[in-house]
Amino acid sequence: MGEKWRNEGKGSPAHGLSPRLQRAESALIIFAKAPIPGQVKTRLCPPLTPDEAASLHGSFVLDALERSQEAGRHGSVTVERFLACAPPADHVFFKIMEERHKVRLLRQTGDDLGVRMDQACKEVFALGYQRALLVGTDVPSLPASYYGQAISLLADHDLVLGPSLDGGYYLIGLKRPIPDLFRGIPWSTDQVFPLTRTKAEALGLKTALLPTCRDVDTLDDLLALVNEKGLSARSANALRLLASRLQSRTRT
């Protein structure tokens, strides 16, 4: 997987951000890691090989980028998309995504996920955006309409959350930086969503919820996704191939 991306392009890492698009009111920040074998989807290895997990992750990133294009067609609201890059931020994969999908690159900075999310919010609000949506890439079947729903809900709410079945959340939307929402959260546990709700209540935030979705972290999640509607043809084919390989391995 890594070799494939290295052969397709080259470029320098993202540096300072230029001013926002003149008409853009909302920033959609997609948090993603480079598809490096052994560094992504590690909870799926085994039974997947590191290369298989990296390939699947790359497909999910592409899905998120393609679906997020629909957010820019949400009525009169203009959305600018950012790809928040995890180390190495200068990986050629991200430069290719920037060129092909017309997203702006944003470095993830901070010691834990909460700090990185808070910093990303601060950066886009400092550029003048009125709303910020942060999403991951673990829900490849996420309907594109959810981005528009989140933006609409922020008109009358301080916070929008998209809960996931495992106790986390796949989307968070804000109208201003709220650092306390990201502090003291045990990331990658089933307490992420409930603790965030508790913090929001303590801060007096009016919160709206999107429908609950399943993200893909474990083998059970992966197998459940095989028959799920709404996947891109690319990810559907990749999942069917992986399921077939897993069945063959269990028979040997």
Task: Tell what function each PLM region has.
Residues 57-76:
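A short, N-terminal amphipathic alpha-helix
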Residues 142-166:
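Conserved donor-nucleotide/metal-binding helix-loop-beta segment in metal-dependent transferases, i.e.
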Residues 179-199:
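Short, glycine-/small-residue-rich phosphate/pyrophosphate-handling segment
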Residues 198-252:
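Conserved alpha/beta core of the MobA/IspD/sugar-nucleotide pyrophosphorylase nucleotidyltransferase superfamily
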Residues 93-131, 189-192:
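Short phosphate-binding loop-to-helix
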